[in-house]
């Protein structure tokens, strides 16, 4: 009563192919044994495991097959989507410090039908591998302590051309855009079986539409818009390119560079 908007998150660990285990612990689930955890949100560990491996190994099918199991959850949109946390190898390390793969992961996290959680430091590509203990993935935030030689909060010690600053600016653009998108917060999700390593999905809410195209392959791919006519019809005339790097939208195709992406938003 005192905190009506306060939510509790359950850290439910289940393997990549076990969404039903996670669903058991979600508050709204109707369990046969009558149990209700009263936990509204759970960490989506199956999605974390499959998504991180999808971007590491260029395997778009892992994304598709994982989200195809959303029917198991009564409210998949209430799950926490993560690319890592304090108990896991950092995402930038998982993708072998590949900036292009990292960006695909961030875009997916920001636009899929989950509540995104970004682990501190991942917004500028902190690395950390679980070797002897968890300390390797829980390093100090640069600038979080007096006397730090580098400070990510004000940029001291970093050049604007540094990798860290580039990733930080990228994240600022993505997440500030997301703040204003009700279609991403509350919209439905429609996705398509990947072709040529390209994963395409659409978020819809009333007349608002956002289309996300991710090329998980290390090669240029040309998408024929007629293959996705139900969401891409009239794309060039009726949609605007919002976020992209070196991706071209033509009258009938979308030309994606290696690890290319584009977010399209209806006018």
Residue ranges of predicted features:
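Active-site-proximal helices and loops of the catalytic beta/alpha 8
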Residues: 1-74, 79, 98, 108, ...
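Beta-strand-rich binding/interaction modules
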Residues: 220-244
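Substrate-binding cleft of secreted/luminal carbohydrate-active enzymes
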Residues: 109, 113-127
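Surface beta-strand/loop "capping" patches
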Residues: 187-206
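C-terminal beta-strand-rich structural cap/linker in extracellular carbohydrate-active enzymes
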Residues: 249-267
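Asparagine-centered strand-capping/turn motif at beta-strand->loop junctions
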Residues: 213-217
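Proline-centered flexible-loop/turn and helix-kink motifs
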Residues: 1-4, 84, 114
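Active-site clefts of carbohydrate-active enzymes
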Residues: 76-97
């Amino acid at each position: 009563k005192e905190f009506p908007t306060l939510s509790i998150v359950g850290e439910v660990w289940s393997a990549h192919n076990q969404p039903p285990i996670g669903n058991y612990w979600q508050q709204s689930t109707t369990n046969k044994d009558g149990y209700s955890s009263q936990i509204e949100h759970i960490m989506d560990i199956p999605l974390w495991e499959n998504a991180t491996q999808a971007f590491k190994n260029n395997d778009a099918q892992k994304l598709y097959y994982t989200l195809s199991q959303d029917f198991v959850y009564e409210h998949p949109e209430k799950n926490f989507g993560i690319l890592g946390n304090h108990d896991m190898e950092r995402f930038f390390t998982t993708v072998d410090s590949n900036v292009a793969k990292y960006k695909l992961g961030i875009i997916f996290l920001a636009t899929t039908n989950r509540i995104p959680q970004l682990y501190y430091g991942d917004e500028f590509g902190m690395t950390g591998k679980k070797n002897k203990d968890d300390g390797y993935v829980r390093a100090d935030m640069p600038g979080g302590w007096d006397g730090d030689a580098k400070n990510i909060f004000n940029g001291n010690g970093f050049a604007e051309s540094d990798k860290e600053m580039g990733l930080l600016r990228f994240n600022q653009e993505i997440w500030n855009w997301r703040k204003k998108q009700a279609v991403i917060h509350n919209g439905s999700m429609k996705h398509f079986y990947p072709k040529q390593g390209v994963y395409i999905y659409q978020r819809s809410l009333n007349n608002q539409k956002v289309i996300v195209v991710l090329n998980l392959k290390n090669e240029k791919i040309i998408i024929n818009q007629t293959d996705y006519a139900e969401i891409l019809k009239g794309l060039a005339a009726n949609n605007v390119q919002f976020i992209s790097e070196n991706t071209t939208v033509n009258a009938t195709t979308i030309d994606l560079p290696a690890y290319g992406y584009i977010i399209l938003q209806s006018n």
